[in-house]
């Protein structure tokens, strides 16, 4: 697909070993009470994952996107990825779990009490983003 000059590619490949390792890390982290929230990165990529997580908690966030291409960072639907929020006191233990299973980690940013979704390249108010996210539902129902 071509959108705003960015050419998309093939659907993401599923690497079962990576999925299995991520699942093991997430189960252990949940069992140990390390995570405050977790959300798979799938439909819509990182942008939708972060927004849905913010909507659920009525919180904001401030992130720095990895890589050089914001479009890829925000909308890639690569498999075997999750966004996790956790207290600072749990970070080292969570990183150790990931390292033990060979699960790569990218620290993106922080959750904020301010209701702003700050993607680094774009910021939206929480209510504005939620309204845009919900808008297709009434339109589809007529």
Residue ranges with predicted function:
Residues 1-13:
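Gly-rich Lys/Arg/Thr-decorated short loops/hinges at beta-loop-alpha junctions or inter-strand turns
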Residues 2, 18-19, 26:
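Charged, gly/pro-rich, cysteine-poor intrinsically disordered low-complexity regions
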Residues 8-11, 21-23, 29-142:
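Glycine-/charge-enriched secondary-structure boundary and capping motifs
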